């Protein structure tokens, strides 16, 4: 039979527009999984995109109740994983003094971020170092910038984590441009 496709089109929610414009406050919440060793637990479907968003939506409701707009999940062994609907990307100083964009390794129990992958492709072309690295909460606080990257919100700058204000990143506008370019080039 012929393939069937469905398409729905809706305006962006105000939450998305505000996150793009103003950034977000986020809470660090434990995900209940180790960063490594998930191969021993294949029944958990870690990193699989499914229609079961119960944990993610509950985490976002919990964050909203605490005055935060988003969540960054941390593994049970203390590593940064992902957001409920985003990939975590940080900016830090690289080995040669250039800005380096980092994100958690794709072999962690996370969903690979297509927006993050496109961002890294564009950023490398513009001279940024980009890499996958094990990150801990302290790395977020020490970073030159923290973003939650996704195909809908694009790049939401994280300005507060667990009530602690982060330094405004010098490259906030540049990051927004990189993500916009990545989205347009990843067609």
Give the label of every model feature segment:
Residues 1-187:
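Helix-start/capping segments and mature chain N-termini
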